[in-house]
């Protein structure tokens, strides 16, 4: 059956079938190949796209702006909206839906992007919330397919760190849909929500995926195709969380030793970025000096190794986001 996503919002991978996700990945591969051949499309010619940002961004903003422009769209970047302050989310959605053909939202609450989608009348795309990050997962899966050279259904992906964060959940949703073996690796006190685990395990019955949690590094990483991590305190979280968080998560830091424990010399290291892997950022250096803690979630050696595909992931944000826009709002 042909896949048609015209007019659909992209809020979470939970809303999409494996066939629909496969379609978006195939379209991403195609658009990337055309871009490299110097062929740009015009699927969004004459269309207007607005980007709503509550949280700062490098990759998400650049990916949406470049992707939209390369397909012919006009883009508005909006950071000073009155949404939720002097104007309700519903009213803002209705106004923007009259002027724009697609709306991207990057912010805090998942309920905000859902409310926008409910009332806008045009596709709404989730650029990140505290609960989910679906565009990142498409980029991750595209990157895995390019480097692992086997189907996603044969991939074992281990997310190590705070397994309650949006990246852990987003990867879990994608893995469940695509029949992958996903392990959330971290301390018991930072275990994923039990209801979400059960929900994903239900999805897995249909796709053959395996979704599990482990606090044992040696067992969890054995045979892994991918080791994935994220910073230990997310955007918007209080800095005071660091001392206890670092104490809990240091055993789950991605090190050369952890990579070796996979028993797979080709294990990929992945990270959604930004990353604390050295002291070359003001924030990381300042916090390490003030707190007297090593807050880096990955060793610099691993981050810069041949196994690291983090910058391929970053590039692939653009190709996959372009695919989402073309598929849902294109001509």
Swiss-Prot record:
Molecular function terms, GO-annotated: amino acid binding; ornithine carbamoyltransferase activity
Known EC number: 2.1.3.3
Keywords (alphabetical) are: Arginine metabolism, Cytoplasm, Transferase
Q: Enumerate the InterPro entries for this protein.
A: Asp/Orn_carbamoyltranf_P-bd (IPR006132), Asp/Orn_carbamoylTrfase (IPR006130), Asp/Orn_carbamoylTrfase_sf (IPR036901), Asp_carbamoyltransf_Asp/Orn-bd (IPR006131), Orn/put_carbamltrans (IPR002292), OTCase_ArgI (IPR024904)
Q: Does the keyword GTP-binding apply?
A: no
User: What residues bind L-ornithine, as annotated?
Assistant: 166, 230, 234-235
Which reactions appear under catalytic activity for this entry? carbamoyl phosphate + L-ornithine = L-citrulline + phosphate + H(+)
Q: Where in the cell is it found?
A: Cytoplasm
Residue sites binding carbamoyl phosphate per the record: 57-60, 82, 106, 133-136, 272-273, 317
Top-level EC class as recorded in UniProt? transferase
- Chief localisation class: cytoplasm
Give, as in the UniProt entry, the pathway in which the protein acts. Answer: Amino-acid degradation; L-arginine degradation via ADI pathway; carbamoyl phosphate from L-arginine: step 2/2
Query: Main role?
Result: Reversibly catalyzes the transfer of the carbamoyl group from carbamoyl phosphate (CP) to the N(epsilon) atom of ornithine (ORN) to produce L-citrulline.
Put simply, this protein is called: Ornithine carbamoyltransferase, catabolic
User: Source organism lineage?
Assistant: Bacteria, Bacillati, Bacillota, Clostridia, Eubacteriales
């Amino acid at each position: 059956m042909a896949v048609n996503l015209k007019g659909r919002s992209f809020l979470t991978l939970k809303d999409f079938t494996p066939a629909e996700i496969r379609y978006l990945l195939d379209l991403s591969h195609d658009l990337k190949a055309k871009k490299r051949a110097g062929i740009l499309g015009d699927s969004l010619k004459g269309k207007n796209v607005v980007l709503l940002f509550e949280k700062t961004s490098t990759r998400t903003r650049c990916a949406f702006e470049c992707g939209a422009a390369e397909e012919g769209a006009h883009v508005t970047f909006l950071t000073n909206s009155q949404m939720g302050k002097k104007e309700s989310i519903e009213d803002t959605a209705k106004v923007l839906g009259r002027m724009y053909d697609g709306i991207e939202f990057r912010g805090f609450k998942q309920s905000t992007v859902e409310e926008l989608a409910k009332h806008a009348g045009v596709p709404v795309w989730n650029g990140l919330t505290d609960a989910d990050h679906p565009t990142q997962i498409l980029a991750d899966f595209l990157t895995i397919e390019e480097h692992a050279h086997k189907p996603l259904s044969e991939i074992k992906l281990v997310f190590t760190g705070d397994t309650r964060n949006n990246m852990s959940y987003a990867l879990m949703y994608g893995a469940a849909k695509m029949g992958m073996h996903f392990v959330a690796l971290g301390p018991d006190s930072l275990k994923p929500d039990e209801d979400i685990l059960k929900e994903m395990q239900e999805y897995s019955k249909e796709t053959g995926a395996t979704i599990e949690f482990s606090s044992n590094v040696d067992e969890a990483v054995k045979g892994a195709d991918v080791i994935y991590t994220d910073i230990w305190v997310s955007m918007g979280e209080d800095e005071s969380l660091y001392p206890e968080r670092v104490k809990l998560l240091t055993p789950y830091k991605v090190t050369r030793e952890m990579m070796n424990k996979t028993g797979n010399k080709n294990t990929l290291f992945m990270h959604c970025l930004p990353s604390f892997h050295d002291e070359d950022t003001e924030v990381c250096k300042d916090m390490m000096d003030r707190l007297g803690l090593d807050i880096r979630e990955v060793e610099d050696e691993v981050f810069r190794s041949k196994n690291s595909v983090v910058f391929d992931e970053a590039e692939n944000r653009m190709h996959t986001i372009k695919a989402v826009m073309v598929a849902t709002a294109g001509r």
